[in-house]
């Protein structure tokens, strides 16, 4: 617990106002949703469309705050505590302007938060529609990645779905990934975190607060 709150204090630009109400601009991007069905290993499947990030709409820190609010909320489910999450990270439309927001120090912060603060187990991370520059950045970041996390990342060549479908059945994937699920069937996670504002106020009582 001490490590959890120490990490939050260190990255206060993300966690100082760790409340859903501070992420409304990021929520307007609608960049993260969940499948209505769990994967074969009972993990929740999240779709993170990083290409929807717009630095003219919200800051990098607000986007990360929203993501970690969602992860914290998912952890309140006992099944998810045990089985974790499977992440689909879609980099379609992720431009050079957006890449420029991911500075080495920010990337390092993300890795550190995952390693020292996030208790939600990541089962696998499927990277889709990655631009060429992503491979270069990934190779530069390899030595900073936690070995356990590194083993879980899978890069899928654009337009090739066989490996993704071998791990996540097409019947629970949306049509854009050559599945059969209508996009309208995806789960809105923002309603979930917005209804838990009191829960996050309680969390802040024990760690970093905007008045500390």
What is each model feature region?
Residues 1-212:
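Basic, amphipathic alpha-helical/coil surface patches used to engage anionic, phosphate-bearing ligands
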